[in-house]
Amino acid sequence: MLSAFKLENNRLLRLEFEEGEKLSDSLWVDLVEPAEQDRLQVQNELGQILATRPELDDIEASARFFEDEDGIHVHSFFYFEDAEDHAGNATVAFTIRDGRLYTLRERELPAFRLYRMRARNQTLVDGNAYEVLMDLFETKIEQLADVIENIYSVLESLSRVIMEGKQGDEFDIALSSLAEQEDISWKVRLCLMDTQRALNFLVRRARLPGAQLEQAREILRDIESLLPHNESLFQKVNFLMQAAMGFINIEQSRIIKIFSVVSVVFLPPTLVASSYGMNFEFMPELHWTFGYPGAIGLMIAAGLAPYLYFKRKNWL
């Protein structure tokens, strides 16, 4: 899908191609899962060659942040959650050339959707492509901050469940959620660090206008403040995971202890029963009137003796 926005009275307005408006009037060209005809339209009308899918997947710095004859290129991760609430990072390719911003991505992203909503009601200060780029990065960092706050809230709830140590369906769900929060935290950290690298490149190489340079530095300071919070989330998740595994080990030890005690308690009675189950001809007790109740009593006594001994030693 191809969308384009022009600047009118310092506001971003979507171009209406049906009404004859052209890409040459745009300040920002946004492509989401573009068809081949969308790519050709951008190339024919603006002379801009867009990044390919394999280029979006490159992770080395030289392929993600560079400048050539087609403009300044920055590839950056953006966080998202799909319809099934699975977290992920999608790469967005930014290109600035001739005062125009191009964005290319393979899916709709929350940060872009939020920025477009805000753009309807707010005006740009300088009205240039760099300002739109910085605003998108700023919106992304705000979103990541909200995700971190949500993880704190979820971990607080999980902490209460795990620290109670009551294992059951709720405990199993808590462990699954804990692993999910760790995965989200890792993706947020990856996104923060990637954005930090992108902004450092722009500060050094993009010759940002004064206002956008200060905005980039402000975003970098925000990232620096969020990274320790993200690190503390990993520590909290690790602590809760270790606590959960500790409770599981304790419960398993209790179960093993019960089986051990049962086996030890029943071993002497089994020995007595086995003795009187032998088919020897000369066994005086077999002809004794009280032989059967005597054997039962001996089995009970043989079982109680180790139990009472363990109890006295506080092993139970």
Curated annotation (Swiss-Prot):
A GO molecular function for this record?
nickel cation transmembrane transporter activity
Spell out the subcellular localization from the entry.
Answer: Cell inner membrane
A single GO cellular-component term from the record reads:
plasma membrane
Keywords on this record?
A: Cell inner membrane, Cell membrane, Ion transport, Magnesium, Membrane, Transmembrane, Transmembrane helix, Transport
Q: Name the InterPro entries for this protein.
A: CorA_cytoplasmic_dom (IPR045861), CorA_MIT (IPR050829), CorA_TM1_TM2 (IPR045863), Mg/Co-transport_prot_CorA (IPR004488), MgTranspt_CorA/ZnTranspt_ZntB (IPR002523)
The record lists the catalysed reaction(s) as: Mg(2+)(in) = Mg(2+)(out)
Q: How does it sit in the membrane?
A: Multi-pass membrane protein
Indicate yes or no for the key word Cell membrane: yes
**Sequence intervals crossing the membrane:** 258-278, 290-310
Q: Does the keyword Ribonucleoprotein apply?
A: no
> Motif Probable selectivity filter residues?
277-279
The entry's free-text remark on domains says: The central ion permeation pathway is formed by the first transmembrane domain from each of the five subunits. Mg(2+) binding strengthens interactions between subunits and leads to the formation of a symmetrical homopentamer surrounding a closed ion permeation pathway. Low Mg(2+) concentrations trigger both a conformation change within each subunit and a loosening of the interactions between subunits. This results in an open ion conduction pathway. In addition, this results in a less symmetrical shape of the whole complex.
> Quaternary form?
Homopentamer. In the absence of Mg(2+), interactions between subunits are weakened, and dimers, trimers and tetramers can be observed in vitro.
Question: According to its UniProt record, which protein family does this protein belong to?
Answer: Belongs to the CorA metal ion transporter (MIT) (TC 1.A.35) family.
What is the purpose of this protein?
Mediates influx of magnesium ions. Alternates between open and closed states. Activated by low cytoplasmic Mg(2+) levels. Inactive when cytoplasmic Mg(2+) levels are high.
Q: By what name is this protein known?
A: Magnesium transport protein CorA
Q: Which source organism does the UniProt entry give?
A: Photorhabdus laumondii subsp. laumondii (strain DSM 15139 / CIP 105565 / TT01) (Photorhabdus luminescens subsp. laumondii)
**Upper taxonomic classification of the species?**
Bacteria, Pseudomonadati, Pseudomonadota, Gammaproteobacteria, Enterobacterales
